[in-house]
Amino acid sequence: HVHMILVPSDADGLRAALGEAHRRYTKHVNDREGWRGYLWQGRFASCPMDETHLLAAARYVELNPVRARLAQQPQAWRWSSAAAHLDGRDDALCTVAPLLERVGGAGESWAAFLSETPGDEDAFDALRLGERTGRPVGADMCRNPFTATDRHP
């Protein structure tokens, strides 16, 4: 499975971008393998989140390959954004500035951020619940104009 932190440019942006990615990848694999039909179990899961949970989500996503024992260090996982954040350089899929600005920069600052775990398990549980339900995660979301009722099915 894949974890991504995405910020859509409009209310329909996430659905449109991921739908197109699913279609293209499915076509690529089906053409290569001579298959027909769907590759994905279902629609992607998503939830809006507040600033605190954004940082917890970043830590969760970048540490996931280590937790799953796919890599010994986050930056060693080929498909992780950890190397880009540690180097402080955008790559083809990741714009690093928005998260680096929140933790004090790249390199040692990002490495220290990844090693912190204050209340992470509670935040991770909240993120998992938000992912399953599609409901907003975090205290600030009550005031956020983008709520679960604004999303398209």
Whereabouts are the PLM-identified features?
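Basic, low-complexity intrinsically disordered segments
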Residues: H1
